[in-house]
Amino acid sequence: MNSGYPVSLQLTGKNITIIGGGKIATRKAQGLLNTGANITIVAPTCTPELAQMPITRIQSEYKPEHIQDAFLIFCCTNNQETNKQITKDAAPHQLINDCSAKERSNFYNMATIQKPDYLLAISTNGNDPTKTKAIREKIEQSTEF
């Protein structure tokens, strides 16, 4: 079994495209806001939180041209066929996370605890996001650094 290699990406100036406008897309965008990345949301509708964020919004169904210049792509729609098509349209050099199917992703997010002087990342290698979140919450409750 191949395991992932954890890294912390410097995203300043990088183009990130999130396809979808729901809760998962909102959570991904919130996590990216302070990275200096150029964030674009593509969705016919979006949550009120996404609508308030200082990001680019394209009110549209997904089209392949939406991901052409993206460094990172997040598939966050509630349509499996759309998510599958996005992963097929992605170029080999693009990093893509299909939030609905880990087998179509070439990276996964980690749960993080960030403080001014450290960043702690927790992962189940994309196998169990709920467990990852529970571990993070347990560490946050029991640790004072």
Regions found by a protein language model. Name each.
Residues E65, E81-N83:
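Short glycine-rich, flexible loops that bind phosphorylated cofactors or substrates
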Residues P44-C46, Y62, A101-R104, N125:
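Short, ordered loop/turn segments at secondary-structure junctions
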Residues M1-T45, E49-M53, R57-E61:
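Hydrophobic, well-ordered beta-alpha structural blocks that scaffold small-molecule cofactor pockets
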Residues E61-D69:
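Short amphipathic alpha-helix with an adjacent loop that forms part of the alpha/beta core around
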Residues T40, A70-N79, Y118-N127:
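Short beta-strand and adjoining strand-loop segment in the mid-core
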Residues Q10, I113-F145:
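Adenosine-phosphate binding glycine-rich loop
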Residues L72-C76, N83-Y108:
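ADP-ribose/adenylate-binding Rossmann-like module
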